[in-house]
UniProtKB/Swiss-Prot annotation:
Cited CDD domains: iPGM_like (cd16011)
Isomerase among keywords: yes
Lineage: Bacteria, Thermotogati, Thermotogota, Thermotogae, Thermotogales
Top-tier EC class: isomerase
Gene3D superfamilies per UniProt: Alkaline Phosphatase, subunit A
Residue stretches in coiled coil: none
Biological process (GO), any one: glycolytic process
Database matches in NCBIfam families: apgM (TIGR00306), PRK04135.1 (NF003160)
Catalysis performed (reactions): (2R)-2-phosphoglycerate = (2R)-3-phosphoglycerate
UniProt source species: Thermotoga maritima (strain ATCC 43589 / DSM 3109 / JCM 10099 / NBRC 100826 / MSB8)
Protein name: Probable 2,3-bisphosphoglycerate-independent phosphoglycerate mutase
Length: 401
């Protein structure tokens, strides 16, 4: 079977270059009252950049397939998201520094609100990180083991936390214990092979125990657990692309994904401005920077149009600071679309901008979904973005005679 990444890696040179991949999570959208958030936002810097760039749109997995953030990012990093199917749990776990061994299965969890039958709020009202941490501590004190499996809880950001299951004979081919939508009955975990059936049984029992411990909490009284995974084996980004790579991201899952592919995690603050300050401070230490902005996705999922617009404008304001660093290539895109009307990830193509001195500049006037749809790059698979970035950076040899 043809491995595109392996093929490209043989053409990568040792040529030094600086590449910035700025990912606005869930960037793509569809019009509300005639405009998408990208169109409605005041983005003079992104629009000026578009005039000097090649634009296009990406398909993260396949046309019509709605990707999770894991597949969306893996694709942007040049990995085949179908070949490398990774549970979100390992990403979240690595992102908060959880040690994962051979006997471990890790999963991502949300605190939720339910009435005993129906899940009312999949995020329990998005509690503050500090409040969630206290609940995680309570669970750690009350629940330590189910059957012969040790249970360990780790706090994450806001409503998120990680569960590690440690024991013999555990599998990770487990369906999500999550109805995926509010107002629906609970969907319990199911194992798809014998080892995973054991894991699913433990997971479902754990959720019932969590509900019992939290029964007096009016908001945080339930948990949804998904993204079950063991530690996967992936080719490492620095070896594939011959670049020292650093990741600047505030949310654990994205830090975990970057760590999984071999990027170094760069500590940063909580705001977009903090992330760009970190980028400038560490500019001489890395060849490739992955910078992640989360809130475009969060507000898309919450159906908050104006808030998504404001995050886009916040990013626009820092574009001159990135350009002033004079990267050889600046890529701006998303990992998937999260349309405000849908309040969820979607299959829609994702806007893509590539800026370098070798672009066919002057053909686009603004950065939005519709300019990108008729851009010079056309519609490409997201896993080709890295190949293009390397080409624009002068890091690929000619193929063939």
């Amino acid at each position: 079977m043809f491995d595109k990444q392996e093929f490209v890696s043989k053409l990568v040179t040792e040529e030094k270059a600086k590449i910035v991949l700025l990912v606005m999570d869930g960037l793509g959208d569809i019009p509300v009252n005639g405009k998408t958030p990208l169109q409605a936002a005041n983005t003079p810097n992104l629009d000026n950049l578009a005039k000097e760039s090649d634009l296009g749109q990406t398909i993260p997995v396949l046309p019509g397939i709605t990707p999770g953030s894991g597949p969306g990012h893996l694709s942007l990093f040049g990995y085949d998201p179908i070949k490398y199917q990774i549970g979100r749990g390992i990403l979240e776990a690595l992102g908060i520094g959880v040690e994962v061994g051979e006997k471990d299965v890790v999963a991502r969890a949300n605190f939720a609100t339910w009435d005993g039958k129906v899940v009312l709020d999949r995020r329990a009202g998005r509690p503050a990180t500090e409040e969630s941490a206290k609940v995680v501590q309570l669970l750690s004190e009350k629940i330590k083991k189910i059957e012969d499996v040790e249970i360990t809880f780790y706090p994450g950001k806001e409503h998120r936390f990680v569960v590690k299951f440690t024991g013999e004979g555990l599998g990770d081919k487990v369906t999500d214990a999550d109805p995926q939508k509010e107002g629906h009955p609970m969907v319990w975990a199911e194992g798809l092979d014998e080892p995973s059936k054991k894991t699913a049984r433990i997971v479902n029992e754990l959720i019932k125990k969590i509900a019992e411990v939290l029964k007096d909490n009016p908001k945080i009284n339930f948990a949804l657990i998904r993204g079950f995974s063991k530690y996967p084996d992936l080719p490492k980004f620095p070896q594939v692309y011959k670049m020292k790579a650093g990741a600047i991201a505030t949310y654990p899952m994205y830090r975990g994904l970057a760590k999984l592919v071999g990027m170094e995690i760069i500590e940063t603050g909580q705001t977009v401005a903090d992330e760009i300050k970190t980028l400038k401070e560490k500019w001489n230490d890395y060849d490739f920077f992955y910078v992640h902005v989360k809130k475009t996705d969060s507000y898309g999922e919450d159906g908050k149009f104006e808030e998504k617009v404001k995050v886009i404008e916040e990013v626009d304001a820092i574009i001159p600071e990135i350009v002033s660093l004079n990267p050889d290539v600046l890529v701006i895109t998303g990992d998937h679309s999260t349309p405000v009307p849908l309040k969820a990830h979607s299959w829609h193509p994702v806007p893509l901008l590539i800026w370098s001195k070798y672009t066919r500049r002057g053909l686009s006037q603004a950065f939005n979904e519709f300019e990108c749809a008729r851009g010079t790059l056309g519609t490409i698979h997201a896993s080709d973005v890295m190949t293009l970035a390397l080409a624009y950076a002068g890091k690929l040899e000619k193929f063939g005679a």
